[in-house]
Curated annotation (Swiss-Prot):
Keywords: ATP-binding, Chaperone, Cytoplasm, Isomerase, Nucleotide-binding. This is Chaperonin GroEL 2. GO terms for cellular component: cytoplasm. Together with its co-chaperonin GroES, plays an essential role in assisting protein folding. The GroEL-GroES system forms a nano-cage that allows encapsulation of the non-native substrate proteins and provides a physical environment optimized to promote and accelerate protein folding. It comes from Mesorhizobium japonicum (strain LMG 29417 / CECT 9101 / MAFF 303099). Forms a cylinder of 14 subunits composed of two heptameric rings stacked back-to-back. Interacts with the co-chaperonin GroES. ATP binds at residues 30-33, 51, 87-91, 415, 496.
Amino acid sequence: MAAKEVKFHSDAREKMLRGVNILADAVKVTLGPKGRNVVIDKSFGAPRITKDGVTVAKEIELEDKFENMGAQMVREVASKTSDLAGDGTTTATVLAQAIVKEGAKAVASGMNPMDLKRGIDKAVEAIVQELKTNARKVTRNDEIAQVGTISANGDAEIGRFLAEAMQKVGNEGVITVEEAKTAETELEVVEGMQFDRGYLSPYFITNQDKMRVELEEPYVLIHEKKLSNLQALLPVLEAVVQSSKPLLIIAEDVEGEALATLVVNKLRGGLKVAAVKAPGFGDRRKAMLEDIAILTGGTAISEDLGIKLENVTLEMLGRAKKVVIEKENTTIVDGAGSKDEIQGRVSQIKSQIEETTSDYDKEKLQERLAKLAGGVAVIRVGGSTEVEVKERKDRVDDAMHATRAAVEEGVLPGGGVALLRAAKALDSVQAENEDQKHGIEIVRRAIEAPVRQIAENAGAEGSIIVGKLREKPEFGWGWNAQTNAFGDLYNEGVIDPVKVVRTALQDAASVAGLLVTTEAMVAEKPKKEPAVPAMPAGGMDF
């Protein structure tokens, strides 16, 4: 086992604080509408330019092991905030730095670290409650656009695209961000349920120009096994022909004689039909077929339910307003399923998302949720160069998470003002002793840090801005760094989602509290590499 180096007390805290400061100082220059960019060198390709706090934090690795531990703890703050709220990573880093700085001073002066931490925790709880009390619900489209614009560093186009996407696919819908092949940014919305399986035979195509199958008001037959013989299906196929409606068959596979029979019937005009493979694999395939059944108001025919193909009736088939099948995907628009059943299925998937620990499963469940609840929107981000596209994509990602968070929990005045205003909640927090009281005061001072940093990045004096904000107690009144003017931030569209502000403070205080209560640090001793002997000169004999 390699030898370890151990540091104690103030020696450990100093090293750790130095690491915290290096990382936080690099991240905090990006805060606010006039925040600067950070250029990150890459081992391959062009350098990356970003204004996203968590991207900067993830790139920082320090040579000194003890300093690096401090930096990594704050990096964890940014990552956690990014995972939970998707934005607010720079605010979280600034808050963590402020709490650790003040906390380290207090411990050095002889205060009890555990009581300080208890005081910090009490203060954070009170502020979070105050933030929730003052939250405003977001309902209008222009408010969603404002949140997106603020998060995208004042880019109104991004805000507009996000508001439009959320309007089209709903709050549960999936919005994905991709890099465009052109210089323009564009939005594409797929309404209804889409899955990545196309037609099994080109003979099913009804629209030759667009090379796709279009079925108006079709019946939908959902079967979890392979279909190789249609004998058992004849009664239901005849009933579909009588109704003169088209039919979509979704099965594990349709092969051989069954596929040939369907194609011949389609070409002769007896039965408007198309067949596609079922989406997904294994258990997820079964779940997705049940989703389609609930969406279309049909029954997924499976042996588990004891339903045989020969017993299938028209009532067991699903219905939809329209189905469009392309070479590689199928879209079911406006399924005839009951709203209550769809809502019940949505709630079930939501609880599965909360319970799962796997990121992969969570992503797949969210995709299923979106397909049931609304649709999928794709924002393709354009730019003149690859570097510009990547930088813009970072901002769109931030903005997308911020708009989601805003719809979820509401909004507060932005620019760090909400935290400053919430400080009044600390007046009623009861401390058990002087050290706890000092912990509460640490948070009172720390929550000024975001406003000060935004002001400094905009070239203003942080203390003067904070002083002026204190003169007027109205919750929504604050300083707009973009215009360098005071006013009602709600009216000016300077707003932050409650979830982002709350998560930033909670995560920052959680990690900062751990750093303040650290008394010893252990790291591996750096190995002294033996010097490599010089190569002998060529052509010499030994």
